[in-house]
Amino acid sequence: MPQSVLKATSEDLKKMKSAYAHHLTDTLPPGALFQAKVPGCTITAYRSGKVLFQGQKAEAEASQFSHLKATDPKSSKTPAVTKYSPPSGIASMSVIGSDEVGTGDYFGPITVCAAYVDASHLALMKELGVKDSKGLKDPQIINIAKDLIKTIPFSLLVLRNEKYNAMQEKGMSQGKMKALLHNQVITSALEKLDGKQPEAILIDQFAEPGIYFKHLAGKKIIRERTYFSTKAEGIHLSVAAASIIARYAFLIEMDKLSEAAGFEIPKGAGPHVDKAAAKLIKLHGEEALRQFTKLHFANTQKAKKWL
């Protein structure tokens, strides 16, 4: 049975329990804090902080909480160093970094960016304010991104909701979509370097390398000097720059959706999003969800309970 495991803080667990308030079960497994069942997935949260998603839609359901750290359910040991682990000294190298935004948001697209930062531009990146985007507010993201897109080579793709939903309904997992998008922006960014080769390619890890490359079977891929790491924004500024540009693009798309909806479209996937989706249905009909949301998220059914 497909499954995903996340590690959550006590505060995260409270928010998750609230998000699944309408789907909680009456009986609990030993050690469980709560259990919820939604179509295609059973979610079990343990007092240890482990949250287990099981079922055909486990990956999709877990992706709503992409800010949480994925973990191997069989081991809590430090991950082994592999050939795909970033080399020591990568922080001072010339690198193409890639990252994505929007995978855990019910509304809005997925935006993926690959950005090249030459070693000679690392100091400039710091001057521009480039750092882990999680520590930046939206106005800062916008200002920094406007400088970045005029300064460094990058490639950006936006997977809007209608196409996302069509791909998902044909059986493609979000993980495969992300792999295809990352590969495409990396390839495109390389082409913009006019033959110059980066010292490394660093991908903000969302899947094990073997799974990532399996998703890309039959595609043109670059394996040489390609590395994966979680929290890669803190490892090289190219990933931080890519994340900032991707988030900037996401904000632009969300503004467009808000204008089309006639009210502000919220980020995230919590209860406030359910209410906004219900409002969208009332104003524009249920079919409007296809252009605004990731339909397979549990929020779709939760929104209907507000009607």
Swiss-Prot record:
<dbReference type="InterPro" id="IPR001352">
    <property type="entry name" value="RNase_HII/HIII"/>
</dbReference>
<dbReference type="Pfam" id="PF01351">
    <property type="entry name" value="RNase_HII"/>
</dbReference>
<dbReference type="InterPro" id="IPR012295">
    <property type="entry name" value="TBP_dom_sf"/>
</dbReference>
<dbReference type="InterPro" id="IPR004641">
    <property type="entry name" value="RNase_HIII"/>
</dbReference>
<dbReference type="Pfam" id="PF11858">
    <property type="entry name" value="DUF3378"/>
</dbReference>
<dbReference type="InterPro" id="IPR012337">
    <property type="entry name" value="RNaseH-like_sf"/>
</dbReference>
<keyword id="KW-0963">Cytoplasm</keyword>
<dbReference type="GO" id="GO:0032299">
    <property type="term" value="C:ribonuclease H2 complex"/>
</dbReference>
<keyword id="KW-0378">Hydrolase</keyword>
<keyword id="KW-0460">Magnesium</keyword>
<dbReference type="InterPro" id="IPR024567">
    <property type="entry name" value="RNase_HII/HIII_dom"/>
</dbReference>
<dbReference type="GO" id="GO:0006298">
    <property type="term" value="P:mismatch repair"/>
</dbReference>
<dbReference type="InterPro" id="IPR036397">
    <property type="entry name" value="RNaseH_sf"/>
</dbReference>
<dbReference type="GO" id="GO:0003723">
    <property type="term" value="F:RNA binding"/>
</dbReference>
<keyword id="KW-0540">Nuclease</keyword>
<comment type="similarity">
    <text>Belongs to the RNase HII family. RnhC subfamily.</text>
</comment>
<dbReference type="GO" id="GO:0000287">
    <property type="term" value="F:magnesium ion binding"/>
</dbReference>
<protein>
    <recommendedName>
        <fullName>Ribonuclease HIII</fullName>
        <ecNumber>3.1.26.4</ecNumber>
    </recommendedName>
</protein>
<feature type="binding site">
    <location>
        <position position="99"/>
    </location>
    <ligand>
        <name>a divalent metal cation</name>
    </ligand>
</feature>
<comment type="function">
    <text>Endonuclease that specifically degrades the RNA of RNA-DNA hybrids.</text>
</comment>
<dbReference type="InterPro" id="IPR024568">
    <property type="entry name" value="RNase_HIII_N"/>
</dbReference>
<keyword id="KW-0255">Endonuclease</keyword>
<dbReference type="GO" id="GO:0004523">
    <property type="term" value="F:RNA-DNA hybrid ribonuclease activity"/>
</dbReference>
<feature type="binding site">
    <location>
        <position position="204"/>
    </location>
    <ligand>
        <name>a divalent metal cation</name>
    </ligand>
</feature>
<keyword id="KW-0479">Metal-binding</keyword>
<feature type="binding site">
    <location>
        <position position="100"/>
    </location>
    <ligand>
        <name>a divalent metal cation</name>
    </ligand>
</feature>
<dbReference type="GO" id="GO:0043137">
    <property type="term" value="P:DNA replication, removal of RNA primer"/>
</dbReference>
<feature type="domain" description="RNase H type-2">
    <location>
        <begin position="93"/>
        <end position="307"/>
    </location>
</feature>
<dbReference type="GO" id="GO:0005737">
    <property type="term" value="C:cytoplasm"/>
</dbReference>
